């Protein structure tokens, strides 16, 4: 028998069960089939049962009416008629009629109540008149004018201007003649130099025609390779130590607390915490009692005690 706990003891399945139970027998984990719904009944499950919509598309009423349990049906048309009948009972007699008849209106255009009545001179009726005949024209004592002068020849004081023709492109022809006269005086074509054109000033501002002096020969110094030495000695870790008598404060021999003596590891034993109870998935007592008592055959007639 090896030392220590076995795997079954570490898992905790063989530990002592709780005393609160309903008397069920132990069922091994492998005794029940895994994913039983994948191999039985219908495999393809389409959409579930249809539920009633919340809209008024399939109802006869235009709006929801309240319906309570035990409430009688109420017809709005019947209630409206009953209300009118109750209001008509409040009438004491016939409708009120004034003692005198309807009075004639007395206002603009009405002569009711006046002493003289309507005036004939202010009547709106049209009077009969003779047909209108237009008067004749006056006698002409002077012949008509030939015009105001605009567009009429030989009417104004001065004589009209004689017509003179003018060429439309006279300016173009004059320029052409000047160009031909200029070309006739030229002796030859334009002078063309077969060299690359240069600027008047040199583009290089440092260019000079003078000869440069000879280069100075610098004597090379002999360099002696010496190891590099810093100007100050190396600093120790922990900050600046310059200006102190000691490089680091010495440890005080008077201890603040007594240090415990450490024993070697070989003499001490390794601490092992005690093993507590292992957790595993279990059903509650109430759930287990319901699963055991209620089945597919007696779920309609079973009567469980409730506390």
UniProtKB/Swiss-Prot annotation:
Keyword tags: Cytoplasm, Cytoskeleton
Gene name of the encoded protein: cfap96.L
Record Pfam families: CFAP96-like (PF15239)
Name the record gives this protein: Cilia-and flagella-associated protein 96
Compartmental location: Cytoplasm, Cytoskeleton, Microtubule organizing center, Centrosome
Source superkingdom: Eukaryota
UniProt region (Disordered), positions on chain: 73-102, 218-279
Family: Belongs to the CFAP96 family.
Keyword Nuclease found: no
RNA-binding listed as a keyword: no
Cellular component per GO, a single term: cytoplasmic microtubule
